[in-house]
Curated annotation (Swiss-Prot):
Keywords: Aminoacyl-tRNA synthetase, ATP-binding, Cytoplasm, Ligase, Metal-binding, Nucleotide-binding, Protein biosynthesis, RNA-binding, tRNA-binding, Zinc. HAMAP family: Ala_tRNA_synth_A. PANTHER family: ALANINE--TRNA LIGASE, CYTOPLASMIC (PTHR11777:SF9), ALANYL-TRNA SYNTHETASE (PTHR11777). It is found in: Cytoplasm. GO terms for cellular component: cytoplasm. It is an enzyme of class 6 (ligase). This is Alanine--tRNA ligase. Transmembrane segments: none annotated. Belongs to the class-II aminoacyl-tRNA synthetase family. PROSITE patterns: AA_TRNA_LIGASE_II_ALA.
């Protein structure tokens, strides 16, 4: 959609002598006080010429630029609020905080929840990976991490705050009065913004080739069919670039110098790259506005312009600028890595962890291309020391950040050992596509740049996409939200039936210990029953739905409830049979299976206890990745970068049992969503993100507070005790803890004791002697195994000395009877085929192992063998085959003869 000219024809512009002009280059309308201006002052229409503008402000660091912006708006009636983490954990559809408006999506922008203040001002650290491949090349125009300083106003139908006129006036005052930019240099470029399902006209503020801010006026919702409908809530969504404000006041040759100061020189030194010639850098930066990274020709033209201007050989210019760009990339990426990990990201192969690993591996790749020996964690440590006052969480989580980065580098180095074999596989393809390269990266973690050299050795050419990492990041930057209907275990016809029913009153929130109740029937459909109120808890938050009885008060007939589910606010009781005596309007009595429910309450409560204990032992990066509470046990999946040690498990268990022994109060709270976020942070959403203005929190006194809709005990002492019974790494970056509490712990102890007694009987000893007896048995087994190995070596030697080969066309074919051990057979076959033109086959019933010498291939032999029926295969010089029927030596020799 394109807005009309009237959307931008503001009284502010008219009163302050701004003229509407059309840019001579891009043909975009813009507003300026300079009547002679022909260009919009944005690149690529102009070069960077802000270096030449007389700006009255003293040079500002990033910290000073941030504070100047926040203070300016604070003095003008805006409430300063704290930024959110760079991980958007209050959103289920987005992994990273890409802009300040994300702080308020979807619940504030939809009108469900009021903002924390109105108007407000914030400086939000943000991460965008869509430009990751462009970082460094444009001298700081593109970054993966940046601070979006923003003032927001939320205009309701009955409450106007401010809109376009005031927003434009604020921007003009800030840039001209606060920063001292000459009024004639300030331009407002007409544009259109869309994002997150919303849209609106916007003005881009440009000065000297640099876009300093975007003023968005969010006023439309984009419908599913692509139409635009007006929003009831009209939002001022601004974004000022803190780093660009610092850059324009410092006038450094790159934004990296303005952002990182002396850290730039330190990185060049640590990485082992000579610092770029200052004159070359200044000239290259001035012409950098001409670079469109998506068009490689513009990069080439830029380098030619620099070469011509300085009279330097083009190759020397390219080499020096390429090296500098790589160092700038590492500066940018290490800050992004630091912020991601400080806010709790655990590198992995999925979700937000995938994006973190992508940035880490890109930084490692660049270091490798620069042939640098510096460890990545050393550079991240420099970033922590530099930013620790701006972002206190980076210092608090320093140990985890550095440990995770070093572990990732070790894993990456191990992965690179696969490069030759992966390159060999790719080399066999007739054409290597971008999709092939993405598949290799996703499956093996190998960047295509590092495959390039290996493929060149094989004379294989392929086109490496310039935006490779952006393409990969785009595929992984969002997650799919399931609707309430997708999450429940109910048939479609049942979901349609309940749409007209009123919400169910949740008695289990009024009294979690209520065991029975009376309710009125609102709906009966097959074996599904809906009441006006219930104390049956529906499955949710990892807690199983309640079971029990529904009693028809007229006939006294009892119906077993086998499960309870919820769709939106309607609770559905699933009965074992259709309730033939119950109809709509009847009164019924409900009784929950209390023993089962109480077990679930204990396991649900102890899950909160263990999660907080894990954070205390392992670090603040621990985040709930999943949970399940059954009557038999609890299960908690947590994010962590390493396998847990026995000592760590013991500490988690000890902390949990200490909290149980402390008899701490467990109390549910209801709070306004934004108030809860401001008070406790987004960690309250560990168990999921509820879609409501008011959220239910569970507080364990002085231990944990988290959003949770489950049922819990009222005091930790009711849990009794907890035992962690299993710990395993279920996927990259995720550890699963299983545990039992209360009566389930007693059951576990009984079962374990029974197994110990049974094991003791089997080996003929008493339970107290079981350990020592097992050690003796294991020692005996080890001794016997050593004897077996010795005997096998004797047999192997005898076999190799006495075995006579068959001769076929100058090839030797050995046939041996299998020894019953596949690895032993494989070793013998390997020795037999150590010389050229040799085939060795081990036969064990209808199973064959086939090996050939290095100058032969096994494929044709396997193909010939399988003609008679069977399965199997292999590659290169070894294969396993299972035939449909056993064959004699003579038959196998004949088959081999045919294959040769």
């Amino acid at each position: 959609m394109k807005a009309s000219e009237e959307e931008y024809r503001l009284n502010f512009f008219i009163k302050n002598d701004f003229k509407r002009k059309i840019c001579k280059s891009c043909k975009t309308p813009f507003w300026t006080r300079d009547e002679k201006k022909e260009y919009c002052s944005d690149i690529p229409c102009t070069d960077y010429y802000f270096f030449d503008i007389n700006i009255k402000s003293q040079p500002l660091t990033v910290k000073e630029a941030r504070e100047k912006f926040l203070s300016f708006f604070e003095k003008r009636g805006h409430t300063r609020i704290s930024p959110k983490p760079v991980l958007a954990r209050w959103r289920e559809d987005l992994y990273l905080t890409i802009a300040s408006i994300v702080d308020f999506q979807p619940h504030v922008t939809s009108g469900l929840v009021p903002p924390p203040a109105n108007p407000l001002v914030v400086s939000q650290p943000s991460i965008r990976l869509e430009d990751i491949d462009n970082v460094g090349i444009t001298f700081g125009r593109h970054l993966t991490t940046f601070e979006m300083a923003a003032h927001h106003a939320f205009n309701y139908p009955d409450h106007y705050v401010y809109w376009k006129e005031e927003t434009t006036a604020y921007a003009t005052e800030f840039f001209t009065k606060e920063l001292g930019i000459p009024e004639e240099e300030l331009n407002f470029k007409e544009s259109w913004w869309e994002g997150g399902g919303n849209a609106g006209p916007c003005l881009e503020v440009t000065v000297g080739g640099l876009e300093l801010a975007t003023l968005v006026f969010m006023q439309y919702k984009i419908t599913d069919n692509g139409n635009y409908t007006p929003l009831k809530l009209k939002i001022v969504d601004t974004g000022y670039g803190v780093e660009r404000i610092a850059w324009i006041t410092q006038k450094t040759p790159s934004a990296f110098h303005a952002i990182y100061g002396n850290l730039v020189y330190k990185f060049f030194n640590k990485i082992g790259v000579a610092y770029i010639d200052e004159t070359l850098l200044k000239v290259a930066s001035r012409f950098a506005g001409k670079i469109d990274p998506d068009n490689p020709d513009t990069i080439k033209i830029h380098r030619q312009m620099v070469s011509k201007e300085l009279g330097i050989d083009i190759k020397a210019v390219e080499e020096e600028l390429d090296r500098a760009a790589k160092v700038f990339q590492i500066l940018d990426h290490t800050k992004t890595i630091m912020l991601m990990l400080a806010d709790g990201l655990v590198p992995s192969n999925s979700g937000e962890g995938y994006l973190g690993r992508l940035v880490i591996r890109r930084a490692l790749k660049v270091l490798r291309l620069l042939k640098s020996d510096v460890r990545l964690y050393e550079l991240v440590k420099e970033q922590i020391d530099f930013w620790k006052e701006d972002f206190p969480q980076v210092l608090k989580n320093k140990d985890y950040i550095l440990d995770a980065v070093e572990l990732e580098q070790q894993r990456f180095e191990k992965i690179l050992e696969k490069v030759p074999s992966i390159a060999s596989t790719l080399a066999r393809k007739s054409e290597i596509t971008t999709e092939d390269l993405i598949q290799v990266y996703d499956s093996n973690g190998i960047p295509p740049d590092l495959l390039e050299e290996e493929l060149k050795k094989k004379s294989v050419k392929f086109e490496l996409p310039r935006n490779f990492y952006a393409l990969v990041a785009k595929r992984h930057q969002t997650s799919t939200i399931k609707s309430a209907y997708d999450k429940v275990k109910l048939p479609k016809d049942m979901l349609e039936y309940i749409t007209a029913l009123q919400p169910t009153e949740k008695l289990y929130y009024k009294d979690q210990y209520m065991r029975s109740f009376e309710g009125k029937v609102l709906g009966v459909y097959k074996n599904y029953l809906i009441l006006d109120k219930t104390t049956f808890y529906p499955e949710g938050g990892g807690q199983l739905g309640d079971t029990g009885l529904i009693i028809d008060e007229k006939s006294s007939k009892r119906y077993e409830v086998i499960d309870t589910q919820k769709v939106n606010d309607v609770i559905v009781h699933i009965l074992k049979e259709e309730p033939s005596t119950i109809k709509v309007g009847d009164n019924v009595r409900g009784e929950i299976n209390w023993e089962r429910r109480y077990r679930l309450m204990r396991h649900h409560t102890v899950t909160h206890v263990i999660l907080a204990a894990a954070k205390k032992v392992l670090g603040e990066h621990v985040w709930q990745a999943g949970a399940e509470k059954t009557p038999e046990k609890g299960r908690l999946d947590i994010t962590h970068h390493k396998t847990l040690t026995e000592e760590e498990v013991k500490l988690i268990e000890n902390y949990a049992n200490s909290v149980i022994s402390d008899r701490r109060q467990v109390k549910p709270l209801e709070m306004n969503r934004m108030e809860a976020e401001m008070k406790y942070g987004v960690s309250i959403y560990e168990g999921g993100v509820p879609n409501s203005a008011t959220i239910r929190l569970l507080e364990i006194k002085d231990w944990d507070i988290e959003s949770c809709g489950g049922t819990h005990v009222s005091n930790t002492s009711e849990i009794g005790a907890v035992k962690i019974i299993n710990v395993e790494r279920i996927q990259d970056g995720v550890i699963r803890l299983e545990y039992v509490a209360g009566p389930a712990l007693v059951d576990y102890i009984r079962e374990t004791q029974a197994k110990i007694v049974e094991a003791s009987k089997i080996i003929g000893t008493s339970p107290d002697q079981l350990t020592s007896r097992l050690r003796r048995i294991l020692n005996e087994i080890e001794e016997k195994n050593n004897l077996i190995i010795q005997y096998r070596r004797i047999i192997e030697t005898e076999l190799l000395n006495n075995l006579k080969p068959y001769e076929i066309n100058g090839n030797k074919i050995y046939i041996i009877e299998g020894l019953g051990d596949e690895e032993e057979n494989k070793e013998i076959l390997r020795k037999l085929t150590s010389t050229d033109n040799t085939i060795a086959i081990s036969i064990s019933d209808n199973r064959l192992q086939i090996a050939t010498s290095k100058n032969m291939r096994v494929d044709k032999i396997v193909e010939e063998l399988l003609k008679g029926g069977g399965k199997g295969g292999g590659k290169g010089t070894f294969a396993n085959v299972i035939l449909n029927s056993k064959k004699s030596k003579e038959e196998i020799i004949e088959i081999v003869r045919k294959s040769l």
